[in-house]
Amino acid sequence: MRNIALRIEYDGADFVGSQWQTNGRSVQGVLEAAWQQLTGERRRMTLAGRTDAGVHARGQVANVRTDTRHTISTIVRGLNGILPEDVGVLAAWEAPDDFHARYSAVRREYRYVIDNGRTPSPLLRRHAAYVPRRLDTAAMDAVVRQVIGTHDFAPLSDGPQEGSTVRICYEARCTRTEVWGQPLVLIDIAANAFLRHMVRNLVGTLIQVGEGRIDADRFAAVLAGDDRRARVLAPAHGLYLMAVRYPEDGTGAADEPAAPHGVTETRMQL
C-alpha cells in the first residue's frame, strides 16, 4: 500500500473548518470525496493542521494510504479537476510508510494578515482582518518577540487541550507591506505545534499593543496568564497556515522543491 502526501491550499471562507464535521462543509470532506471520485476508494485523509472556520491555508499537508496505481502527476491533475474552486492540490509525493501528516511534523508556520488602510478594501474583506487605526508595527514587532522560545502557552489557548500546553516558538515577527496600494500588517509565527486559538489570541492581544491600548508589560502579563481581561481573539479570516515542515525534507512542505508534480504559477504573496 502506498502512502501519498499532498500539499494543499484553500480559501477557508466557506468551510466550517479543515476537519471532517457533520454540521457543514469541511476541507477534509471535499478532499475525501474527490479522492473517492478519482480512485474509487473511500479513504480517510489525515491533515497536518486543524484550522477553524474561515481560516485559510497555503501549505496544508495531508496524507492518505491507497492502493491506487495512478501516477503522482495524474493524482494532482485529477484531484484539481474534481475539487471545488476554493481548494487546490499544489503538489503530491510518495511518502515513507511511517509518514503521518500531523505527527511527523516538526514545525508549523502561520501568517496573520491585517488590512490597515484608511478604509477597508472590498477585495480583502474575506482574507484580511480590518483594523482602521494605524498600527505601530515597530512596537508590535518588539513585543511579539517575547513569545520566542519554550513557553507554556495555555494562557493563549481556548478549550480543553490534549497533553502538554508547552510549545517551542521558533520565530515571531511583525512587518508592514502593501498590496494594490492598501497597507497591510503581517504577523508571522512559527512553532513546533499550536494550541487551539493560540495564534488568534496572540494576534488579537498584539493588535492592542499596536493601537496603544496596552504596553509591553501588560502583553507579558497576558502571556503569563495574569491578565486574561486584556486577551482578545482576532477574527479567523485573517489567518493562514503557510507551511508544515518535516525532518526528512529539510525545507518544508510549502517550499518549491516539493512542487515538480504540482502547480507552478506566479502568486501575490500576502
Curated annotation (Swiss-Prot):
Top-rank EC class of the record's enzyme: isomerase
UniProt KW Cytoplasm keyword: no
Gene3D superfamilies: Pseudouridine synthase I, catalytic domain, C-terminal subdomain, Pseudouridine synthase I, catalytic domain, N-terminal subdomain
BP GO terms, sorted: tRNA pseudouridine synthesis
SUPFAM superfamilies listed in its UniProt record: Pseudouridine synthase (SSF55120)
Active site: 52
Binding site for substrate: 110
Keywords, alphabetical: Isomerase, tRNA processing
Signal peptide residue numbers: none
Annotated CDD domains: PseudoU_synth_EcTruA
Pfam families: PseudoU_synth_1 (PF01416)
Enzyme Commission number, as recorded: 5.4.99.12
Known catalytic reactions: uridine(38/39/40) in tRNA = pseudouridine(38/39/40) in tRNA
Segments of this protein annotated with the region Disordered: 251-270
Record flagged with keyword Transport: no
Gene Ontology molecular function, alphabetical: RNA binding; tRNA pseudouridine(38-40) synthase activity
InterPro entries assigned: PsdUridine_synth_cat_dom_sf (IPR020103), PsdUridine_synth_TruA (IPR001406), PsdUridine_synth_TruA_a/b_dom (IPR020097), PsdUridine_synth_TruA_C (IPR020095), TruA/RsuA/RluB/E/F_N (IPR020094)
HAMAP family xrefs: TruA (MF_00171)
Family membership: Belongs to the tRNA pseudouridine synthase TruA family.
Quaternary structure (record): Homodimer.
PANTHER family in the record: PSEUDOURIDYLATE SYNTHASE, TRNA PSEUDOURIDINE SYNTHASE-LIKE 1
Biological role stated in the UniProt entry: Formation of pseudouridine at positions 38, 39 and 40 in the anticodon stem and loop of transfer RNAs.
Protein's name according to its UniProt entry: tRNA pseudouridine synthase A
Source organism (scientific name): Roseiflexus sp. (strain RS-1)
Gene: truA
